[in-house]
Amino acid sequence: MKYIFTLFVLISCSNNNSLHLSNLELFDDIMKEHDDLMLEMKNIKNIKSSLLEIDGIEEDNEAIKNLDVARMSMMNFMKDFSNEFSFDKYPMDKKTHDNLEEIDLLQVNNKLNEFKKSIDDVSDKFETSMSSGQKILDGIE
C-alpha cells in the first residue's frame, strides 16, 4: 500500500510539472507574439495615416476600419489578459506554481489556450489589415 501511495504522489507531481511546463511554454508563446505585434502597432498607425492623406479615403473606408479593428483587438487582448493574469499570480509569477493543485494548473492551461487563440486572431487581423492597406498604398505610388 505504501508503494501505491508513493507511486500516486510521483505520478501526480509529474503531471503537475508537465502542466506547469506546458503553461510556461504557452505563456512564452503568447508573450512573444504580443511583443511582435506591439512592434507592428507603429506600422498600423503609419499605414492608416498614409491612407488618410489620399484624396477620397475617409475614416469610413474599409481598409481604415480594418486597421482600427486590428488595433482595438490588440488593446482588448491586453486588457483581458492583464485582468485574467495579474503580475503577482501564476503564470506571471512563475514561482507560485508550487502552491497550485493540478486542477488549478489545468484551469490556467485552458485559459492560456484561449488567449493563444485570441492572440493568433489578433495577429491575423494585423496581417490582413496591413496587407490590404499597403496594397492600396502600393497601387497609388
Residue ranges: model-predicted function:
Residues M1-L7:
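Sec-dependent signal peptide recognition
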Residues T6, S18, K79:
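Residue-level marker of positions within ordered structural domains that often coincide
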Residues A63-I119:
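Long, amphipathic, charge-rich alpha-helical segments that form helical bundles/coiled-coils
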Residues I30-E33, L37, M41, H97-E141:
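C-terminal amphipathic alpha-helix
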Residues N15, L39, N76, S82-N83, ...:
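Generic detector of well-ordered secondary structure
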Residues I44, K48-E59, F81, F85-D88, ...:
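Secondary-structure edge/capping motif, primarily at the C-terminal ends of alpha-helices
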Residues V9-S12:
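C-terminal motif of bacterial Sec signal peptides marking the signal peptidase cleavage site
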Residues S14-E62:
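Immediate post-signal-peptide N-terminus of mature secreted/exported proteins
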